Every structure is written in structure tokens, then in C-alpha cells.
Amino acid sequence: MVTFEFDGEKYKAASKHQKEWGNDLISEFSFKGNEAVLDLGCGDGVLTEQLALSVPRGTALGIDSSVHMIETAKTIHRNNLKFTHLDINKMNFENEFDLIFSNAALHWVKDHKQLLKNSYKALKACGKILWDFGGFGNCANFIDVIQKKISEHNYAQYFKAYEWPWFMPSKKQYMDFISAIGFSSYTIKERNKDRYFSNASEMIRWIDQPCLVPFLKQIPQELKETFRQEVITEMLKRTQQPDGTYFEAFRRIRIYAQKQEETR
């Protein structure tokens, strides 16, 4: 997996909709208050703090592959809250967590078969996963714009061996993955969370963090701003609505699964 470095503070300012989805996801879980919780791709740590508040007699650990994200997250202090710089693909926990949570992060992980195996291993008996991430059809406008842009003559040479940064599966595709792991029960839902950004500035903040990050990494410094401006111009032109808002398709996949009980 290729890792990318994000600006934690800029992401915090641009991730209003991700936080809304995350709080909705947290509200779905019935906490006892003493769980050990792992947050995969914790980002700026705001949602991990909400998890910590939900388990006053438990613990919440947030992990992220971005140093800057973890630095931002570590400005949040709770006695039962910890953040660690760790690539999700390299986690090696065993029988440690009652809940593995993730919001708006796991579409950055390419190998979900291994992710599911590692997560199953990390859960205690009867432990649960609760994930929400980009699914099939997510960010359709941006993906169309960026795919055309990186194939243009001025930029194509920098993307010859480029590894696409996201994995956004359909419900059927993910059902095939999870059914092979051994969870005692699981539910997969596809969700339409299409969004109208209130103005151009709001959409641009989202384009900058996180959408453009993996593509700007490929381009020489002297071309980065030109590339950025061209993408932004095309996105605003393509997505502007008559009322001055800007539309993007957000299609989510939500995963709930429970590990089997211990066999005696």
C-alpha cells in the first residue's frame, strides 16, 4: 500500500460531512461503556475522542498512517484515549478489542481480504466491527475529472505506473470477501450520502484535502499548482448547481460484523 501524507488541520476544516457520517455511525452502536475500541484511520482524532467518551470505563486507540494526522490527533487529551502512528496494513493485534470502528478511511486500503483477517484476529470473542467507507460510485464527478486529467499529454508521463489510491467495492463484492472470514454474523448496506457543498470554497477545501493529495505526489513541484487549478476549475464547472451549491456523489458501504464466541 502506498501511504500519503495529509495536513491534519486542513483536513479538520474540510471534513464536515465525514464527521456527520461518523457521528451517525457511532450512534448506531450500543455501548456498555467498558469496551476496548480501535479506530482505523483515525485522522484528526475528533471521532476517536467521541468513541473514548462513549466508553468511560474502557479505552479508545486511534491509528493512522499519516504522521501529520496523528500529530493533530495528539492535541486531544483524554485519560482513556491514545493515538499511534501505524499503517492499518501492518497492524498485528490479537484478541484485544471489543469494537473495531472506522469511518471514511478504509477505501484507502487496497487489500480488504487481509484487512478483514487482521481485524478478525484483533477482536476478542464476540467482538464487532463497524465500518463505513467509500463504495461503488463514490465521488463519481471527481474521479471522472481526475482520470481525464492524468491522461492528458502534459501529465500522463507522471502516471505511467501509477497505482490507483482507492478501493471502492460494491455490496456483492464485499459480501464475497467477508463471507470467507468466519464472522458469526454480518450485515452490509449500500448508502447514498450525496452532498451539496454550500459554496465553492467548501468544495475546494474538500478537493485539496484529501482528494488531490495522492495525485499531486506524482507531479513535479513546478507543475503542482497548475494541475491543482485545472482540476478545481473543471470540478467547479461540472458540479455547480443553479442555486450556487456544488454537487458530488457520495456512495457509502457500511459493514457490521461479529466474531464468533470462543469454543470450549
Features from the language model and the residues they span:
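A short glycine-rich, Lys/Arg-flanked "PGG" loop and its adjoining helix->strand segment in the class I
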Residues: K113-K128
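A short acidic, Gly/Pro-enriched loop at the edge of an enzyme's catalytic core
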Residues: N89-I100
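A structural alpha-helix within SAM-dependent methyltransferase catalytic domains
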Residues: I26, E49-A52, L116-Y120, Q147
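A short SAM/SAH-binding and catalytic strip from SAM-dependent methyltransferases
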Residues: L99-H112
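Conserved class I S-adenosyl-L-methionine
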Residues: M1-E35, V46-Q50, M69-T72, L130-H153
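Conserved Class I S-adenosyl-L-methionine
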Residues: V46, F167-R264
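Class I SAM-dependent methyltransferase SAM/SAH-binding core
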Residues: L38-L40, D44-M91
